[in-house]
Regions:
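Catalytic cores of secreted or luminal carbohydrate-active enzymes
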Residues: 58, 84-120, 144
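Noncatalytic carbohydrate-binding groove/subsite architecture in carbohydrate-active enzymes
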Residues: 1-68, 85-87
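Flexible, surface-exposed loop/gating regions in the mature catalytic domains
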Residues: 70, 78-82
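Hard-cation-handling environments
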Residues: 31, 123-144
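Acidic/polar loop patches that form or flank catalytic/metal-binding clefts of enzymes
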Residues: 65-72, 102-104, 115-122, 184
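Solvent-exposed loop/turn segments at secondary-structure junctions
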Residues: 35-38, 74-77, 141-142
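C-terminal beta-sandwich/jelly-roll accessory domains of carbohydrate-active enzymes
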Residues: 137-255
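A structural motif corresponding to the C-terminal end of an alpha-helix
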Residues: 14-26, 60-67, 110-116, 175-179, ...
């Protein structure tokens, strides 16, 4: 795993500078096999950690590579036998039953962003597409020192969040200064209680394997929380982000 949470960013900064100092300085850079670790049995791969990990790294590395390919799409991986568990730490965005893992949602959030970058920080990004504004926020929690140093003994099949440093909720306030305008806001929320199918699996007794009724419940629980609000342009918005949480706000002006 990445010992430093800036590992991907630092590596790409180094690579881009190294390429620029060669006669091939104008070649494209494509990262074809990227994930949080090279271990297809890393139990962290199933946890809520993966959604903000993906969002933060893709946002932070804008402009450093022409593409970054996630490894892989599903947990059905021809280089290894199928895992013994429904959630065995596979690389994929989908598990072997086709359930959406947190990494799937990380890429879904990125897919909703606009093509014009307005503002970017370490915990949120603001974009625009046509007349719509997108605000994507996340509360990233990195590994603790034990796990970051390559010792997996601090976690188990059912206790995986002991791999992470303790961190509290984050509060983000948004203020509009357009009192004459009105907006429709759609909010999508991901955290351990909303959209993290691994956590729902734990909550439902960690069935191995789940039967069809249990799978249907898990499919439902793997979806994001969402709701619509209508706001005046002078309203203030306060968003509470749980650890490992991601929230997307989409604003559309109302004529």
């Amino acid at each position: 795993c990445y010992k430093d949470e800036n590992g991907t960013y630092d590596s790409l900064v180094w690579l881009k500078k190294a390429v620029e100092n060669t006669r091939y300085h104008d070649v494209e850079i494509h990262i074809t096999e990227w994930n949080s670790s090279p271990n297809c049995r890393d139990l962290v791969h199933d946890t809520a950690f993966m959604a903000p990990f993906i969002v933060q790294n893709y946002i932070k590395t804008i402009g450093l590579a022409d593409s970054i390919g996630f490894w892989t799409f599903t947990d059905i991986f021809e280089e290894e036998s199928l895992g013994q568990s429904v959630f065995h730490g596979g690389f994929g965005m989908l598990n072997i039953q086709g359930l959406k893992k947190p990494s799937y949602h990380g890429f879904w959030f990125l897919s909703r962003l606009g093509n014009e970058l307005l503002e970017r920080t370490d915990s949120y990004v603001i974009t625009r597409k046509e007349n719509r504004i997108q605000v994507l926020m996340w509360n990233y929690c990195h590994y603790n020192d034990v796990y970051a140093n390559g010792d997996p003994t601090c976690i188990s099949q059912l206790d995986r969040y002991s791999a992470f440093a303790e961190k509290g909720d984050e509060l983000i306030q948004i203020h509009f200064d357009k009192p004459e305008e009105k907006f429709r806001m759609i909010q999508y929320t991901f955290d351990r209680a909303h959209g993290s199918v691994f956590d729902s699996w734990l909550e439902n007794g960690a069935p191995e394997p789940p039967d069809e009724e249990e799978l249907q419940i898990l499919r439902t629980k793997s979806e994001l929380e969402s709701h619509i609000s209508y706001l005046d342009g002078a309203d203030d918005i306060c968003i509470r982000l749980k650890p490992h949480g991601v929230t997307l706000l989409e604003f559309t002006p109302i004529k």
